[in-house]
Amino acid sequence: MFPGFRPSDHTDGERALFAAFVAAGLAGAWVTLIVTNRLLGEESLFFEFVSVHGLWNFIAGAIGTVSSIYLNRRWFGHEGLAGLRYAAGAILNTTFVATLIAGTFALPFYGTMFGPLAIVGTFWTSPAVLAIWLFVLAGVNLAYGVYRRERASVFEAKLPSETEVYFRRL
């Protein structure tokens, strides 16, 4: 580890966010490799990236996904029915922005234009990829929920109970 860095120094919400960002980055990198391989005519869900191009697509997918989640962070982690609506919008927007960013890095201009279309085609033909993507982004939503509740608990007012002596009515 790094000197001065211990996982125990961080709160549960921060650790949950870190795990969610790592999982989403890996899932986004994997989906990016699937999409770019399908654009090249290969239909495999599991493969080895042995070229510099494959490695760069992997990195571009991770960067695109993590930065897209960061840009949409205000919509993740809310409670209730409104939180469910926010999460659905965040998942759609995160998917779109991630394809724009990763597509621009992976294949400039071509990837920017056809990235969103290619991801829709990939999700349409491979429901397993869509299910994994939605599962990971639902995990991001849960992690942001833990983080938001943790941050909100810092500012909760501690009201005295009626059993305490100085609170009783005279």
Regions found by a protein language model. Give the residues of each.
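Juxtamembrane/disordered regions of integral membrane proteins
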Residues: 1-170
